[in-house]
């Protein structure tokens, strides 16, 4: 049995399923009045894609004998799986089709980049070099990828907040309903837009939606930040074990520190300064781009310890 062929076919199937799910979610949002239950099809498709990704990662782990995070291809698959897992949890809690409409396209692009851009050789498992044969590898890289997945999602909600608010300062203290499920808020907003001629009613629904986006972005970023912190610390221990230095100002390390500072500033401004709305959404939105520079951008430089086994 050629596991490489099976894994490749499964990964391509994931791409097709995610493309289908994205189409379903966008149709469901575009024709909200007539397709209220259509998003369930998209959610089921995402669950199937997530199960397939779990199978791919699990089979690579069993066949190769090590945790499948040793190269760029495997990390992209793991990131896709992480994003889908977090999205499914949030959708289960909120019953919101909006979450799927913005997260599925990102997961699709990541999976497409892994399958359509990387060469066949880069997609194959290969024996680990001595520096990577460490238990710290699983902790460091898995924590970093979990942090990327959660922080990307939280950042996307921040960007969505800025788009819906049209980059305006919105007073979110007017309402005291931040704990409302996002699903109910989506219903308020879209039904007001579709059925009510009153601008006052539609603006109330919009305000509720913005309040919920602000609340959920804060929760998700608050979840991802500890993962990032643990990942950086574990990476330092691993580096000292492998190369005799906790920190070498490698480009990846530098950008990981920048990413940590951006999200630490976001959380600090919310917890101690009481910021919310536009100000924190800008910080969170900035974090989205910083994450991608840290994760992929510095790999194209071909410099530093992290360029080995990824993209050089």
From Swiss-Prot:
<dbReference type="GO" id="GO:0005886">
    <property type="term" value="C:plasma membrane"/>
</dbReference>
<comment type="function">
    <text>Required during biogenesis of c-type cytochromes (cytochrome c6 and cytochrome f) at the step of heme attachment.</text>
</comment>
<feature type="transmembrane region" description="Helical">
    <location>
        <begin position="220"/>
        <end position="240"/>
    </location>
</feature>
<dbReference type="GO" id="GO:0017004">
    <property type="term" value="P:cytochrome complex assembly"/>
</dbReference>
<feature type="transmembrane region" description="Helical">
    <location>
        <begin position="47"/>
        <end position="67"/>
    </location>
</feature>
<keyword id="KW-0793">Thylakoid</keyword>
<dbReference type="InterPro" id="IPR045062">
    <property type="entry name" value="Cyt_c_biogenesis_CcsA/CcmC"/>
</dbReference>
<comment type="subunit">
    <text>May interact with Ccs1.</text>
</comment>
<feature type="transmembrane region" description="Helical">
    <location>
        <begin position="98"/>
        <end position="118"/>
    </location>
</feature>
<dbReference type="InterPro" id="IPR002541">
    <property type="entry name" value="Cyt_c_assembly"/>
</dbReference>
<feature type="transmembrane region" description="Helical">
    <location>
        <begin position="281"/>
        <end position="301"/>
    </location>
</feature>
<feature type="transmembrane region" description="Helical">
    <location>
        <begin position="254"/>
        <end position="271"/>
    </location>
</feature>
<keyword id="KW-0150">Chloroplast</keyword>
<protein>
    <recommendedName>
        <fullName>Cytochrome c biogenesis protein CcsA</fullName>
    </recommendedName>
</protein>
<comment type="similarity">
    <text>Belongs to the CcmF/CycK/Ccl1/NrfE/CcsA family.</text>
</comment>
<keyword id="KW-0934">Plastid</keyword>
<dbReference type="GO" id="GO:0020037">
    <property type="term" value="F:heme binding"/>
</dbReference>
<feature type="transmembrane region" description="Helical">
    <location>
        <begin position="144"/>
        <end position="164"/>
    </location>
</feature>
<keyword id="KW-0201">Cytochrome c-type biogenesis</keyword>
<keyword id="KW-1133">Transmembrane helix</keyword>
<keyword id="KW-0472">Membrane</keyword>
<feature type="transmembrane region" description="Helical">
    <location>
        <begin position="12"/>
        <end position="32"/>
    </location>
</feature>
<keyword id="KW-0812">Transmembrane</keyword>
<feature type="transmembrane region" description="Helical">
    <location>
        <begin position="72"/>
        <end position="92"/>
    </location>
</feature>
<dbReference type="Pfam" id="PF01578">
    <property type="entry name" value="Cytochrom_C_asm"/>
</dbReference>
<dbReference type="GO" id="GO:0009535">
    <property type="term" value="C:chloroplast thylakoid membrane"/>
</dbReference>
<dbReference type="InterPro" id="IPR017562">
    <property type="entry name" value="Cyt_c_biogenesis_CcsA"/>
</dbReference>
């Amino acid at each position: 049995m050629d596991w490489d062929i099976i894994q490749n076919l499964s990964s391509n199937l994931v791409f097709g399923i995610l493309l289908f799910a994205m189409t379903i979610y966008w149709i469901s949002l575009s024709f909200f009045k007539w397709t209220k239950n259509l998003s369930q099809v998209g959610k089921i498709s995402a669950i199937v894609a997530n199960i397939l990704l779990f199978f791919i990662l699990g089979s690579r782990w069993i066949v190769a004998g090590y945790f499948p995070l040793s190269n760029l291809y495997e990390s992209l698959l793991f990131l896709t799986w992480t994003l889908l897992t977090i999205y499914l949890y949030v959708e289960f809690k909120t019953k919101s089709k909006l979450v799927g409409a913005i997260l599925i396209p990102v997961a699709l692009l990541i999976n497409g980049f892994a399958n359509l851009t990387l060469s066949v050789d880069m997609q194959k498992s290969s024996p680990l070099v001595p520096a990577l044969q460490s238990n710290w590898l699983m902790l460091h890289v898995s924590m970093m990828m979990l942090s990327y997945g959660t922080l990307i999602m939280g950042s996307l909600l921040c960007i969505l907040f800025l788009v819906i608010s049209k980059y305006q300062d919105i007073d979110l203290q007017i309402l005291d309903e931040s704990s409302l499920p996002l699903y109910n808020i989506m219903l308020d907003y879209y039904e007001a837009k579709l059925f009510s001629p009153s601008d006052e009613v539609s603006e109330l629904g919009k305000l509720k939606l913005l309040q919920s986006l602000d609340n959920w972005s804060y929760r998700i970023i608050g979840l991802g930040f500890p993962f990032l912190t643990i990942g950086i610390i574990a990476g330092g221990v691993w580096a000292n074990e492998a190369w005799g230095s906790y920190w070498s100002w490698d480009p990846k390390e530098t950008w990981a520190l920048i990413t940590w500072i951006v999200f630490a500033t976001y959380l600090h401004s919310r917890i101690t300064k009481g910021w919310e709305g536009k100000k924190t959404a800008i910080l969170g939105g900035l974090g989205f781009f910083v994450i991608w520079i840290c994760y992929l951008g510095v790999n194209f430089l071909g410099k530093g310890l992290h360029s080995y086994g990824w993209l050089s």
